[in-house]
């Protein structure tokens, strides 16, 4: 049996001590049997933690988890913050118990789930870092390479044809040897072009040459790398075509006749869901089949899966060793990528099958969207076209208690329109907006600079992996 390190125990105990009394009072005010049981469990949890009776925490953790997680799944969220607080304290009890039992995989599983659900990172990340390093040292792989993408399986003829009148400008970075380290006359000239023509004017561009030699370009192309080193880690996966599209379909169905809605139980048009999965299950069930698909630009919704906008770098910090920050970002001097929750956001990973779709929206941070593996189509509209884009407010995610927490960068303004196959009779103002859009296809090593406030629509044309480097100019 392992001892639980004081550096982990003390901050966890302080959180429980400071929260459990108020949480218990809030639970009792709900006046139902489950809430009453949670209150009893939390009092037992505090007593056992205070007495360091960690070997008795298993049943308490399981009881709290069952009561809170079932409510989340049934209701699509927690109606009261005390339920989230109960869940988090129960998870911390589970982490403590399984750590002392020396069960590395189970402890990391609970840590991952807690991380995704918004438990305090300062409590989780030190434990996750210790255990993930132990897991890596005990993991060896003799399995053959599993390519995320093979160009012979990519049907380039099905890619969108880029209108030359709407192409995003391409600039170079690190064209010659001097650029490799962000120094030398060639690089300074390249950076001057970027800063004067794009950064200062808030104009999108594609940057070529900088990321080509990042280790992840080849390393992450092998799905076996993720299977061998991180296969048991829990991640949030979006299944089916994008959530907002599904909500629109649901609203339309609710307006149909009684005869039509009577058949809704067999209607597969509402096909978006989110699920916590082991990374290996996501790869084996979705990524590998998609990599073998010779027309992944048209992957049907039931086969679409997306690890979208997730803080996988924080969760698996060893991934930091495989890439660099874009040179232009390092050189600006007046810009910074935020790396902590207090300061902002760290680089995020987007990993998915072909035909994942991100509806048109804008972010409040500038972004270097870097394509690592595969291909993506991106269409951009400037902020001055906002009145022509048929934006709607996504009211459904106002609750902070959804299965996967909301993005810090996504705005409420979003468009449900299919921008690649537009019904101009229904959306005539898009004829005006379409005089001003720009577009591109990103391939491995391409970096797209997207200024804050620019609307963007993104669709993967193959299995794909991208990195977002959001930053804010001082």
Curated annotation (Swiss-Prot):
This is JmjC domain-containing protein F. Pfam families: Cupin_8. It comes from the Eukaryota. InterPro entries: Cupin_8 (IPR041667), JmjC_dom (IPR003347). PANTHER family: HYPOXIA-INDUCIBLE FACTOR 1 ALPHA INHIBITOR-RELATED, JMJC DOMAIN-CONTAINING PROTEIN F. Residues 251-261 have a biased composition (Low complexity). Residues 247-269 are annotated as: Disordered. Residues 305-474 form the JmjC domain. GO terms for molecular function: 2-oxoglutarate-dependent dioxygenase activity. Transmembrane segments: none annotated.
């Amino acid at each position: 049996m392992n001892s639980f390190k004081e550096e982990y125990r003390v901050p966890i105990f302080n959180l429980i001590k400071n929260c459990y009394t108020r949480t218990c009072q809030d639970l009792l005010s709900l006046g139902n049997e489950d809430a009453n049981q949670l209150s009893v469990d939390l009092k037992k949890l505090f007593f056992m933690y205070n007495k360091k009776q960690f070997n008795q925490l298993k049943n308490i953790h399981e009881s709290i988890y069952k009561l809170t997680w079932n409510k989340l799944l049934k209701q699509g969220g927690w109606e009261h913050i005390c339920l989230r607080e109960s869940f988090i304290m129960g998870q911390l009890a589970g982490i403590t118990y399984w750590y002392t039992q020396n069960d590395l995989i189970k402890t990391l599983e609970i840590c991952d789930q807690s991380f995704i659900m918004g438990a305090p990172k300062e409590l989780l990340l030190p434990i996750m870092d210790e255990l993930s390093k132990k897991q890596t040292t005990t993991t060896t792989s003799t399995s053959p390479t599993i390519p995320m993408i093979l160009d012979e399986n990519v049907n380039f003829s099905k890619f969108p044809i880029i209108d030359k009148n709407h192409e995003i400008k391409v600039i170079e970075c690190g064209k010659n040897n001097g650029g490799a380290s962000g120094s030398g006359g060639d690089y300074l000239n390249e950076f001057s072009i970027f800063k004067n023509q794009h950064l200062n004017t808030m104009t999108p561009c594609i940057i070529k040459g900088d990321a080509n030699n990042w280790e992840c370009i080849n390393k992450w192309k092998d799905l076996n790398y993720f299977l061998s080193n991180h296969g048991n880690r829990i991640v949030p996966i979006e299944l089916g075509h994008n959530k907002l599209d599904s909500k629109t379909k649901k609203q339309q169905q609710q307006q149909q006749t009684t005869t039509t809605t009577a058949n809704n139980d067999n209607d597969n048009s509402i096909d978006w869901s989110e699920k916590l999965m082991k990374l290996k299950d996501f790869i084996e069930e979705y990524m590998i089949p998609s990599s073998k698909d010779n027309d992944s630009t048209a992957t049907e919704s039931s086969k679409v899966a997306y690890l979208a906008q997730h803080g996988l770098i924080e969760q698996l910090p060893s991934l930091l060793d495989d890439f660099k920050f874009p040179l232009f970002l390092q050189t600006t001097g007046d810009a910074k990528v935020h790396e902590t929750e207090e300061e902002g956001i760290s680089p995020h990973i987007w990993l998915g099958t072909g035909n994942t779709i991100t509806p048109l929206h804008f972010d409040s941070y500038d972004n270097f969207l870097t394509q690592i593996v595969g291909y993506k189509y991106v269409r951009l509209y400037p902020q001055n076209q906002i009145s022509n884009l048929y934006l709607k407010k996504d009211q459904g995610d106002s609750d902070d208690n959804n299965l996967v927490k909301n993005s810090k960068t996504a705005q409420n303004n979003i468009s449900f329109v299919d921008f690649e196959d537009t019904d101009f009779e229904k959306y005539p103002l898009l004829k005006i907006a379409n005089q001003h859009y720009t577009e591109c296809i990103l391939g491995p090593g391409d970096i797209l600079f997207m200024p804050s406030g620019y609307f963007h629509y993104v669709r993967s044309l193959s299995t794909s992996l991208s990195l977002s480097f959001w930053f804010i100019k001082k």
